[in-house]
Amino acid sequence: ATSAPAKHDNIXVPIAMFGGSXNYASHLYLYD
């Protein structure tokens, strides 16, 4: 996913940490 839902607006920080790639999806599942 290239765009994050409004509910995950604060994911900007984890994206910086994970790099915002495949790990982005994993983070969504872990913190959904």
From Swiss-Prot:
Record keyword Mitochondrion present: yes
Gene Ontology terms: biological process: ATP biosynthetic process; proton transmembrane transport
Location relative to the cell: Mitochondrion; Mitochondrion inner membrane
Keywords: ATP synthesis, Hydrogen ion transport, Ion transport, Membrane, Mitochondrion, Mitochondrion inner membrane, Transport
Stretches of the chain forming a coiled coil according to its record: none
GO cellular component, one term: mitochondrial inner membrane
Record's keyword annotation contains Membrane: yes
Assembly, per entry: F-type ATPases have 2 components, CF(1) - the catalytic core - and CF(0) - the membrane proton channel. CF(1) has five subunits: alpha(3), beta(3), gamma(1), delta(1), epsilon(1). CF(0) has three main subunits: a, b and c.
Cited function: Mitochondrial membrane ATP synthase (F(1)F(0) ATP synthase or Complex V) produces ATP from ADP in the presence of a proton gradient across the membrane which is generated by electron transport complexes of the respiratory chain. F-type ATPases consist of two structural domains, F(1) - containing the extramembraneous catalytic core and F(0) - containing the membrane proton channel, linked together by a central stalk and a peripheral stalk. During catalysis, ATP synthesis in the catalytic domain of F(1) is coupled via a rotary mechanism of the central stalk subunits to proton translocation.
Family affiliation: Belongs to the ATPase delta chain family.
Protein name: ATP synthase subunit O, mitochondrial
Provenance organism: Spinacia oleracea
Organism lineage string: Eukaryota, Viridiplantae, Streptophyta, Embryophyta, Tracheophyta
